[in-house]
Amino acid sequence: MPNQHMLLLFNLLPVGSNISIWWNFGSMLLTCLALQTMTGFFLAIHYTANINLAFSSIVHITRDVPYGWMMQNLHAIGASMFFICIYIHIARGLYYGSFLNKNVWLSGTTLLIILMATAFFGYVLPWGQMSFWAATVITNLLTAVPYIGTELTNWLWGGFSINDPTLTRFFALHFILPFTIISMSSIHIMLLHTEGSSNPLGTNSDIDKIPFHPYHSHKDMLMFTIMITMLFIIMSFTPNIFNDPENFSKANPLVTPQHIKPEWYFLFAYGILRSIPNKLGGTVALVLSVTILLTMPFTHTSHMRSMTFRPLMQFMFWTLVATFITITWAATKPVEPPFTSIGQVTAILYFLFFTMNPLLGWLENKISMTNT
């Protein structure tokens, strides 16, 4: 009997009839999560969390384990797909005012923070040059915390430098956090289904709802197919497109790479971090670059939920998208002019979106009131 109720919940779940393709990314994220969990499990079977053997175990997986190359590439490219989907998912939430469903938005932002931590721990595991030095630079930011910073850093490292205990605990965290993500995702979906999804118009969908299956389930299946096809095309033809060439060399604490940078999906935050020439200031800006999303439900002043009929906010939104892309590009470049200036300007523009949001909402309300 409970199974029957579960099927009814899936089949007869009422969903607004006018939700567009941008609402498909939630289910695509679920697919990515399932894929990452499965491939990650098979990789963990053959991986060795030891600084002398970690790099060799990755080589062993790709060369000797049957289909190991496929698992390793799917896991690496799948992480990039995960972040592409989540950034589009967040952009849709910002554009269509999904953040007004406070509980869903706050649980989603928490999920993003946990996901970023998981991806960071995973990037360290191959113990390549960039893995080691990215871990050194990012964990070293904890020393910026007043009074307890040094103790915190040593506690995280398990010693006075990044060494074997660090790799062991990062592997343990990388293994356990996805289960936290799965639990949080369930809460996120349950909270969503108490109120239901928003729609492109930003209106109440109650007057025009259709069953999730077969209508939206088929639309989701199409996007799954496109995503999996893209994943396999990248894996087959350009499997190392998202990798850093430095990471094909084993970690060497005595040789510093010319330009230390994290994976591409953290470059926007890294760009904001290095745009401030102060360690504590940069660390605060880095944390704010993600946590500022938490302010969105509380700073919304417009009478309209969606940006569909708000041209001023649309302009700000697309400026944010362009800023995000530019800051990501600038963060791949060395710390020298003009890239430092570009980084600083784009960092200001990034935070400007969140500060202008309540002001433009208030202005649009004034304009609409004078026109009626």
Swiss-Prot record:
Binds 2 heme b groups non-covalently. The keyword Membrane applies. PROSITE patterns: CYTB_CTER (PS51003), CYTB_NTER (PS51002). It comes from the Eukaryota. GO terms for biological process: mitochondrial electron transport, ubiquinol to cytochrome c. GO terms for molecular function: metal ion binding; ubiquinol-cytochrome-c reductase activity. The chain crosses the membrane at residues 25-45, 69-90, 105-125, 170-190, 218-238, 280-300, 312-332, 339-358. It is found in: Mitochondrion inner membrane. Component of the ubiquinol-cytochrome c reductase complex (complex III or cytochrome b-c1 complex) that is part of the mitochondrial respiratory chain. The b-c1 complex mediates electron transfer from ubiquinol to cytochrome c. Contributes to the generation of a proton gradient across the mitochondrial membrane that is then used for ATP synthesis. This is Cytochrome b. It comes from Pantherophis vulpinus. The lineage of its organism: Eukaryota, Metazoa, Chordata, Craniata, Vertebrata.
